[in-house]
């Protein structure tokens, strides 16, 4: 901590503003629970997206206030009315989206804290009166942890996550698991199709795992695009994989991932859920810097073609470029080879 802490004794109340997406909410959870461990008497209120609420509901000692972005101005107004009698010691605005800054206007807090210069976007600096010190390390979670540091919370020796997953959800997830074999989850879809790996390569990896007596499970959200993707992949498999696509809530997915030996996923929520469950994950990256966005604790397991493509597109390494540098090339995920992924599967002792 290279600055004077904002609080020299635990504050009475804090408001956390991080609406989405699932992966970022997993990062924020680590920070919130780190604060909670050091300041157990501090009242914590977290404004979170409606979808992400499905993962966080039930976590101990945190008041969760859901916000549905589809509700527009009416939803913002209702949120303000719900919180109007709250006077927080500080607001941690951990989302740079303009929508989050608008929401922050109606939240009463002595200190409104935002990101530092490198990581602040969409004019967030106009809506805050304090800014954290951006860390030297590029990972998103480290940037979130800077908020705890700014408050005066001691650094974490080891991050941990505690989701409230019920016995019923764990029991439901068991139907997809083979307890006599190792279990591999392939979650093939990200939020954007360009970040997905190739259908035939997912199938090839699944076939290789099956040949090594691994139980292969496919999962996805109920979105039509994702269900169709899984259908195309499984049609190319030499065997009948377990199809859990569209059949789990976020908590049931977390329970399923907890019981698996390994997850393979592009840049997506399930990859970060795996981190919360302590399950190894092989992240597949091309468009975003894995040092910034890969599953925490799993950066060494990544298969990435980002750095070589940064050099091609920008003519310099990612360390010399702006913190968020997304690549623009077409079909970059096609540069990830099956052999690279299989090598990581072996390194992680799947077979």
Q: What spans do the regions from the language model cover?
A:
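Catalytic machinery of carbohydrate-active enzymes
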Residues: 1-351
